[in-house]
């Protein structure tokens, strides 16, 4: 092998090595100037800009450590699948005045996006919650916002102490959350775990929620939402709604909550609509194989939802609820009201089914009871307490 050929061969190997390295598509933000003593926002944006242009799958790595990060928006479309691997603890500015109205970390318009890594997004919200309680601050940012994602996965991520919602999901399709964790104190205001709206085929599975508001809340135009093997508590339970508060809300169709456990929550499984509401539709909603442990209001349909008592309760909700089932719900209630089904006088409920309910209450007031208004569900199996019958302890 002559010298010229050896040199040529060596150059080819160097090219292939460089090409192979680029094809692995790993973009470590520390290579873009990120360090633990400064805001990593610019480094993350620069890494994303390059990764987004890659024609082969790429991974942005935020390595282990603790970093500060201001508001960041990662916006596609990108040329190939992209993974954001958060191994670190990311801390938001604690002073709410340092943040503009919007979200802390936003991911928009991506296909085949993955967020992973076992990291923590810490909203550092104590000062913001105090500000919110005093009503002296602007709208506070959510920790995470996912908009117009398709065929994407969020896994092994924790969101901690968000200033508002932990996660907002909007206009997404085929999005999965797995081993996703939400953590905030029970008294943290408006800290819904995941809020889903205008999205279809969203899966939330094997995940844990401890927060100050709904663990999972469902907004309008949600279709085919699957919630499986989720733990909730503290928090306000899993809620479809509140609905009917805005004009032109689209139907909620296909919500399936299965094999979930609620512990020390203010509610269990719930559908809630405003009185004097705009028209709306809730259809094909099923709560099955649910365990409640010391839960206030374990089973609820509330069409007179008015948390701040600033509603016209004389006018009925115009949200039509149909094809809803509560099946195999067992455990203990913190209040005597184990089952509460309050239907609107304005539009009839249809196809409401209650089966195999066994919820006990051990307070001095007496055993658990149900309350029913303007509703006559189909009953299957056993119900303890009796539901919507003459033998119910409280029924109207």
From Swiss-Prot:
Region (Disordered): 364-396
Superkingdom of the organism of origin: Eukaryota
Chief location bin: secreted
KW Repeat (keyword) present: yes
One GO CC term on file: extracellular region
GO terms, molecular function: polygalacturonase activity
GO biological process, one term: cell wall organization
Signal sequence, start to end: 1-22
Disulfide bonds: 215-232, 372-388
Catalytic activity from the UniProt record: (1,4-alpha-D-galacturonosyl)n+m + H2O = (1,4-alpha-D-galacturonosyl)n + (1,4-alpha-D-galacturonosyl)m
Tissue expression from the record: Pollen.
Annotated catalytic residues: 213, 236
Keyword annotations of the record: Cell wall, Cell wall biogenesis/degradation, Disulfide bond, Glycoprotein, Glycosidase, Hydrolase, Repeat, Secreted, Signal
Pfam families recorded: Glyco_hydro_28
PbH1 repeat boundaries on the chain: 172-198, 199-220, 252-273, 282-303, 316-356
Enzyme Commission identifier(s): 3.2.1.15
UniProt-listed SMART domains: PbH1 (SM00710)
Positions annotated with a glycan in the UniProt record: 143, 151, 174, 181, 203, 208, 259, 294
InterPro entries: Glyco_hydro_28 (IPR000743), PbH1 (IPR006626), Pectin_lyas_fold (IPR012334), Pectin_lyase_fold/virulence (IPR011050)
Keyword Transferase included in the entry's annotation: no
Location(s), subcellular: Secreted; Secreted, Cell wall
Family: Belongs to the glycosyl hydrolase 28 family.
Function: May function in depolymerizing pectin during pollen development, germination, and tube growth.
Protein name: Polygalacturonase
The organism of origin for this protein: Nicotiana tabacum (Common tobacco)
């Amino acid at each position: 092998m002559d010298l010229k050929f050896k040199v040529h061969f060596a150059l080819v190997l160097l090219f292939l090595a460089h090409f192979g390295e680029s094809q692995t598509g790993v973009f470590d933000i520390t290579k873009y100037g990120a360090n633990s003593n400064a805001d990593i926002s610019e480094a993350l944006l620069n890494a994303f800009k390059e990764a987004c242009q890659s024609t082969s799958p790429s991974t942005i790595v935020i390595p282990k450590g603790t970093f500060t990060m201001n508001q960041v928006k990662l916006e596609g479309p990108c040329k190939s699948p992209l993974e954001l691997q958060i191994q670190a603890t990311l801390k938001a500015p604690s002073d709410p005045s340092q943040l503009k109205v919007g979200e802390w970390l936003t991911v928009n318009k991506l296909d085949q996006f993955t967020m992973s890594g076992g990291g923590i997004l810490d909203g550092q919200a104590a000062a913001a919650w105090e500000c919110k309680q005093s009503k002296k601050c602007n709208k506070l940012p959510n920790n995470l916002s996912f908009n117009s994602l398709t065929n994407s996965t969020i896994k092994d991520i924790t969101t901690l102490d968000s200033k508002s919602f932990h996660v907002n999901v909007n206009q997404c399709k085929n999005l999965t959350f797995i081993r996703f964790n939400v953590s905030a104190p029970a008294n943290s205001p408006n800290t819904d775990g995941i809020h889903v709206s205008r999205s279809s085929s969203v899966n939330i599975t094997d995940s844990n929620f401890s927060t100050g508001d709904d663990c999972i809340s469902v907004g309008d135009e949600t279709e085919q939402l699957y919630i499986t093997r989720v733990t909730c508590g503290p928090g306000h339970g899993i809620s479809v709604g509140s609905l009917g508060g805005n004009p032109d809300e689209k139907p909620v169709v296909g919500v399936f909550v299965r094999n979930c456990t609620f512990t020390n929550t203010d509610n269990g499984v719930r559908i809630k609509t405003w009185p004097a509401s705009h028209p709306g539709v809730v259809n094909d909603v099923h709560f099955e194989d649910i365990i409640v442990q010391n839960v206030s209001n374990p089973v609820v349909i509330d069409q007179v939802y008015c948390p701040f008592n600033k509603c016209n309760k004389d006018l009925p909700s115009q949200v039509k609820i149909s094809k809803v089932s509560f099946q195999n719900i067992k455990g203990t209630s913190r209040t005597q009201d184990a089952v509460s089904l309050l239907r609107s006088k304005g539009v009839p409920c249809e196809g409401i089914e209650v089966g195999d309910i066994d919820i006990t209450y051990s307070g001095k007031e007496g055993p658990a009871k149900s309350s029913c208004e303007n509703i006559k569900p189909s009953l299957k199996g056993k119900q303890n307490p009796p539901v919507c019958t003459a033998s119910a302890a409280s029924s109207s």
